[in-house]
């Protein structure tokens, strides 16, 4: 979902191929021939697989700088983006399956880290896209963690973005397993 949002923000054409976790599509011989990791998302760039949400988003932001999804020429902010992306991948994503207190603690850290602005880096970026994707999934699970006004604000701002609306609309039509 996050990679699709970024692609819609950038405005480049792409072909999405839905993958089902329930059918174990990522473990099929055809998919493993393209991507030995068997991971999603996966982008093919010049015939080579690029996996992991953070890597795909970083690639898109650097490949299409005109979209301004990563501050150009600002090493400190770029390092903050990498810090955020690492935290999301290692501090939030793995605990999503654990539920309960683990999830609440991870989101409490994200809430404090977010600060008082509208966007994680002070302006809209790949960090907001990545953070939103996991927060969106959490909010659509039974008994979601709550009490995160900054992240709720991010959620509302993201849901208002045309790229997010378009992504949700398209992914629901192609059969992507979206939470209800």
What are these regions (language model features)?
Residues 25-27, 157, 177-178:
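Short Asp/Glu-rich motifs
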Residues 1-101, 105, 111, 120:
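GST-like domain detector, emphasizing the conserved glutathione-binding G-site
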Residues 167-180:
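Terminal-tail/helix-coil boundary detector
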Residues 17, 53, 148, 168-169:
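Residue-level detector of family-conserved "landmark" positions at structurally sensitive sites
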Residues 20, 126, 171-172:
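Short, solvent-exposed turn/loop segments enriched in Gly/Ser/Thr/Pro and often Arg
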Residues 76, 84-167:
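GST-like fold's C-terminal all-alpha helical module
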Residues 48, 134, 172:
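Flexible loop residues that form catalytic
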């Amino acid at each position: 979902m996050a990679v699709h949002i970024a692609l819609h923000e950038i405005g480049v054409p792409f072909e999405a191929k839905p993958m089902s976790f329930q059918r174990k599509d990522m473990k099929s011989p055809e998919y493993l021939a393209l991507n030995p990791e068997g991971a999603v998302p996966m982008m093919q760039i010049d015939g080579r697989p690029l996996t992991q949400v953070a890597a795909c988003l970083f690639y898109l932001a650097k490949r299409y700088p005109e979209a301004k999804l990563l501050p150009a020429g600002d090493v400190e902010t770029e390092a903050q983006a990498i810090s955020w992306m690492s935290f999301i991948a290692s501090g939030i994503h793995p605990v999503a399956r654990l539920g309960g207190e683990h999830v609440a603690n991870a989101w409490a850290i994200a809430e404090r880290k977010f600060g008082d602005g509208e966007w994680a880096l002070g302006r809209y970026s790949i960090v907001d896209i990545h953070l939103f994707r996991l927060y969106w999934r959490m909010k659509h699970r039974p008994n979601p963690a709550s009490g995160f006004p900054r992240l709720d604000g991010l959620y509302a701002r993201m849901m208002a973005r045309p790229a997010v609306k378009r992504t949700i609309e398209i992914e629901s039509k192609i059969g992507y397993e979206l939470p209800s």
